[in-house]
From Swiss-Prot:
One of its GO terms (molecular function) is AMP binding. CDD domains: PRTases_typeI. Gene3D superfamilies: 3.40.50.2020. One of its GO terms (biological process) is adenine salvage. The keyword Glycosyltransferase applies. PROSITE patterns: PUR_PYR_PR_TRANSFER. It catalyses: AMP + diphosphate = 5-phospho-alpha-D-ribose 1-diphosphate + adenine. Keywords: Cytoplasm, Glycosyltransferase, Purine salvage, Transferase. This is Adenine phosphoribosyltransferase. It comes from Nitrosopumilus maritimus (strain SCM1). Homodimer.
Amino acid sequence: MNLRDKIAEYPNFPKKGILFRDFSPILKDPSAMESIADEFSKYFHPKNIDIFAGIESRGFILACILATRYNKGMMMIRKAGKLPGKTTKISYTIEYGKDTIEIQKDIIEEGQRVLICDDLLATGGTAKAAAKLIEKVGGKIVGFAFIIELTDLNGMKGISKYDCKSLVKY
């Protein structure tokens, strides 16, 4: 299946000069979601993954699709202040300032192997911070799974030490 055909494009969203690539049409097509799971299954072996981590918020969707396929658990990486209970946080630099993400403290056991999922890789800042956060609590990064990669923004550069797979590149 050509997933590129399923990705909608919205010029000047969320602001002028941005071309927003949206994978939402994939979600209404069960065969497209199945195709995504099939493609990542060729690349990441289930025996090498203990839990999937979804980056807020669209990464949750991909992580759930893959966790269901692999019969594994899923955890959420969220913006600060969005998770109940004790959390571990990390701050990182973004284009115009700082941002903070967090995970629940007890969600990962020491040594668990984690595949981090997100819909899109742009600059790689959030992805890199997510890896550092998981490693901070003792998780081992198996790699990254992205539906879309914006290659001009060189996001892979910051996470190149990890095994990374993106399905559609622009």
